[in-house]
UniProtKB/Swiss-Prot annotation:
Protein name listed in UniProt: Large ribosomal subunit protein bL27
GO MF entry, a single one: structural constituent of ribosome
HAMAP family in alphabetical order: Ribosomal_bL27
Gene that this sequence comes from: rpmA
Keywords: Ribonucleoprotein, Ribosomal protein
Protein family membership: Belongs to the bacterial ribosomal protein bL27 family.
Length: 88
């Protein structure tokens, strides 16, 4: 057996925990105010109607309603609409 660890083994052993990014509430789901819709780095999704953006670009619901994904001016947006209008 080796008496020294070897060059590479002593430099290994680091890994970071996952950040749990991604969409948390999907289209058509009913949410309450304050619920997190998307955790993201940068603005992959932009806030729309009744949606706010946190300091780390997290999108959250400002009002209760149904989640709606859309595109406006070439940007992916997320809106919160009244649940009654979701008859589709």
């Amino acid at each position: 057996m080796a008496h020294k660890k070897g060059a590479s083994s002593s430099r290994n052993g680091r890994d970071s925990a996952a950040h749990r990014l991604g969409v948390k509430r999907f289209g058509g789901q009913v949410v309450k105010a304050g619920e997190i819709l998307v955790r993201q780095r940068g603005t992959k999704f932009h806030p729309g109607v009744n949606v706010g953006r946190g300091g780390d670009d997290t999108l959250f619901a400002k009002a209760a309603g149904a989640v709606e994904f859309g595109i406006k001016r070439g940007r992916k947006t997320i809106n919160i609409v009244e649940p009654a209008t979701q008859d589709a």
